[in-house]
Amino acid sequence: MSNTVNEYSTERKAFIITGPTSGIGRCTALELARHGTVVLVGRDPRKLYLVQKTIEGKGGHAVSVICDVSDLTSVRHAAAEIIALKLPLAGLVNNAGVLAMQATKNAQGWDTAFATNHLGPFVLTEALMPHLPDGANVVFVCSGVEDPERRPAVVAGFRGGRYISAEASARGEWKSGGSTLPGADAYATSKQCNLATVTAFARETPRLRFNAVEPGFSPATGLGRDANVFVRFLGKHVLSLFAPYIKYWSTPERAAKVITNAVLNGAGVTGIYYDERGKPMLGSEQVRDPKFQDRIVAETRALLAKTPM
């Protein structure tokens, strides 16, 4: 299902974003709408409608495509729907993500967090790549928690990516010695896979630009939507007030500007990982290894090839 806007101009560039209905994704969608048509990809029709109407109310253009990014069949259908719109695509933002407090399975029987954060964006990106023009920007919203040496992540209880293999991750299995925080290993590992994918794709497909953004810790975002009411209230109404003044922290609005700048960047840069201030940063030692990057991409493709969708 799609909901196209009236009076669409084929001269306007179009930008695709997943997870556009709250937090960083919503702010980024509103930023991108200042520069072209925004394809809003999300699972909740009502929330998509509200964001689309907000964009249109500001004089922008938007298209809504319903998709559960954790369901790979849904992702395939969404990609086909986007392609069928025949919009002048200029960029893709893989923003949808989840930090699940409890492990669950997706429609294919795989770990939902790993499917949402890595497999879904991987499938969507590969499906759309042939339809993106030379120089188009693909941005993955990543996270520094994949790095076991990143101090704020360690203080928060993360222990870095715990990758064994794509199949093990799909089963919800992680390398021993990880975090005691519920969902932390799944989140960190999936985000490490995101970053590895960005750098591998940047080498594989030089006609496109692949970059990553660490948006900073934003207490008001929806990543922890499975957390209890008190934790969600604390993040949204208390901690978010201090975010602009703390290193490694940010706000959805500030993160949106960094992401939008990466999408609009016409300098031809690729394979860059930006921090919450828009400055280049390094990922973990492991994820910087080209062999590790290629392994994750190869194993992900092999896993997907065996899966009926």
Q: Where do the PLM segments sit?
A:
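A generic structural signal for short coil/turn motifs at secondary-structure boundaries
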Residues: 101-102, 282-285
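Active-site oxyanion-binding pockets that recognize sulfate/phosphate
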Residues: 107, 184-187, 245, 286, ...
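A generic "alpha-helical surface" signal
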Residues: 46, 73, 253, 291-294
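Rossmann-fold NAD(P)H-dependent dehydrogenase/reductase core
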Residues: 2-219, 307-309
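Short aromatic-enriched loop/helix-cap "lid" or pocket-rim segments at secondary-structure transitions
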Residues: 150-154, 222-227, 285-286
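Alpha-helical membrane-targeting segments
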Residues: 160, 175-184, 217-254
